[in-house]
Amino acid sequence: MRFVVLGAGAIGSVLGARLAQAGHDVHLVGRRAHVDAIRAHGLRVQSPDREDVVRLDAVTDIATLDSLVDWARVHAVVLCVKSQDTAGALRELARYADSRVPILCAQNGVSNEDTALRLFANVYGVLVACPTAFLEPGVVRTYSSPVTGVLDIGRHPRGRDAFAAQVSRVLSGAGYGSEVYEDITAYKYGKLVTNLGNAVEALCGPNARGGNLDRLAMDEARTVLFSAGIHAEFAPVSALVQVRPVRGERRPGGSSWQSLYRHTGGIETDYLNGEIVRLGRLHGVPTPVNAELQRAANRLVAVGGEPGSVSELDLLRAVVDGRDQPRREA
């Protein structure tokens, strides 16, 4: 198959490499420094067992890609940008690609698929459980072996079809665990709940993952989803995703941690914790924990702070102060 991977960060770069190694035609779209390194030296993919250098076509923008590909022969665009960048990336893509090209939203959060439906007719949700890292241009790491990760798929808003089954087979052949789900959105809501700890990890460091703040954020989310009538399913990924050190080093942190570490100027907390806050406000459910995590993460980005530089105790105190309480009229 022929794929365009839009958003060559950690997830997108590793996926592009694995697809290319399995014999598929892949074009990456990424940031300038990363693209330059891939062009000059190939993409270095470090895993627990080995290091591969994969030669891939890589460009920095859709306009350049348009001169290189026949969109009628592109089987799918895999969207791997962070959720805050989705709308802009899709608008640019829509200037060149046919609206019928399948869009695979291999992203955290639950808003990307609806955004894609505004411009493209065939949209698929992809649940992503792939422990990866991108800490320098031209080099990515994948920490799960022998299975690279889990990429479950389903048509959005729901349904199974032959194309989803075909993509799932391709992903399985490229080293991923992949199932086709009738209601992929339910599984992405389940993943959203687990991703609420991304902000905790980014703010307070990896040791805070799974702690009190993380559990409180997830408890809030479950209450909100119940009140909103939203069903969340939790995919059984732990049996397949076996996290191991790479070159003797553990994974430093998740995607939000990496955004702060690399000072990318953005973080997707608005579409993770912020999604719970939005739903809570719609349905009258207080969400002080997720609101504080959202506020603190955006503040740390604004001041150029480092990951792990915020005290978990200070965040808990801020929650108790009731920053997310609605104002009452006098």
Task: Show where each model-derived region lies.
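Rossmann-like NAD(P)(H) cofactor-binding subdomain of soluble oxidoreductases
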Residues: 52-139
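Rossmann-fold dinucleotide-binding core
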Residues: 72, 106-193, 197
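NAD(P)-dependent Rossmann-like dehydrogenase/reductase catalytic/cofactor-binding core
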Residues: 211-330
